[in-house]
Design a protein with these regions (language model features):
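A short glycine-rich, aromatic-capped structural motif
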Residues: 4-81, 85, 100, 178
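Processing junctions and N-termini across compartments
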Residues: 6-7, 14, 86, 114, ...
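Disulfide-stabilized extracellular ectodomain repeats and their linkers
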Residues: 10, 28-29, 106, 158, ...
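Structured loops at beta-to-helix junctions and adjacent beta-edge loops in soluble globular domains
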Residues: 22-23, 33-35, 40, 112-114, ...
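Short, solvent-exposed loop/turn elements at domain surfaces
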Residues: 28, 39-45, 118, 192, ...
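Functional-site microenvironments in short loops/helix caps that host divalent-cation chemistry
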Residues: 77-210
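Short proline/glycine-enriched turn/loop segments at secondary-structure junctions
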Residues: 211-218
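Short, structured beta-strand segments at or near domain termini in extracellular proteins/domains
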Residues: 220-234
Length: 234
């Protein structure tokens, strides 16, 4: 038979997750993925990687937190929530996401209160839709264009998870600022943190928040990570 996973006595979180310490309101704290999620397809007795450049649509997928892989973009909040659930996790609440991003010292960029160029993946020079389609007017950016799988395959766009090793904080979470936007569990549809083109327009660093889209929206720039309640070591 298959051996069941055994948790460490030193951490209440699953592999690939960081433990965020408790507060007076939540003494146990919570767990959050160290890395932006990648996906594996798990329907029809399969367990195979899902392309990070394709929307999962009707496929059954589960979220994975792993270093050194292309994180999943092109994903809606509903799809992200289902992928977290399939992994025994859940999407992070806004407050959980923001606390983990800011780190234990509660700083705007996690690593500090001042932006340090190059620490995070946030300075891609050319908008990928313009680069790929030569479409400089946003009126020409339709749903099909914004979900083209080639966008995140262009050089200098999305980075491998954890590749920007200093885009982190003492909690040991990576890429919460930049790389891909990240969905939270807000039922109205919220994603946070900015992406490889911008971590400024809708707020600086961990304060970056977009609320313009509903939970079924997806495009190349949006990914996610999962949270979970800690499990007692006893």
């Amino acid at each position: 038979g298959v051996a069941r996973p055994v948790r460490s006595q030193l951490t209440p979180c699953a592999p690939g997750m960081a433990h965020i310490p408790g507060t007076a309101q939540n003494p146990a704290g919570y767990c959050i993925d160290r890395y932006e999620a990648s996906l594996r397809r798990v329907d029809d007795n399969r367990d195979v990687p899902w392309s990070p450049y394709l929307t999962p649509e009707r496929a059954t997928v589960r979220a994975v937190s792993a270093r050194g892989v292309v994180p999943q973009g092109y994903v809606s909040q509903r799809q992200a929530a289902a992928a977290c659930s399939a992994a025994g996790k859940r999407l992070c609440a806004d407050t959980e996401w923001t606390r983990a991003c800011r780190g234990p010292r509660v700083q705007t960029f996690g690593y500090g209160n001042q932006r340090e160029t190059g620490r995070c993946n946030e300075n891609h020079r050319w908008h990928p839709v313009v680069q790929l389609f030569r479409a400089t007017s946003q009126e020409l950016w339709g749903h099909v264009q914004m979900n083209d799988p080639q966008l995140n395959q262009l050089p200098g766009t999305v980075a491998l998870t954890g590749a920007h090793g200093s885009c982190s904080n003492e909690f040991g979470v990576y890429d919460m600022v930049g790389n891909l936007h990240e969905w939270t569990a807000d039922p109205n549809g919220t994603f946070r943190g900015g992406y490889y083109m911008d971590t400024t327009i809708n707020g600086a660093g961990c304060n970056y928040v977009t609320t313009a889209h509903d939970t079924s929206y997806h495009d190349y720039s949006i990914g996610f990570r999962c949270c979970a309640d800690p499990v007692s070591a006893h």
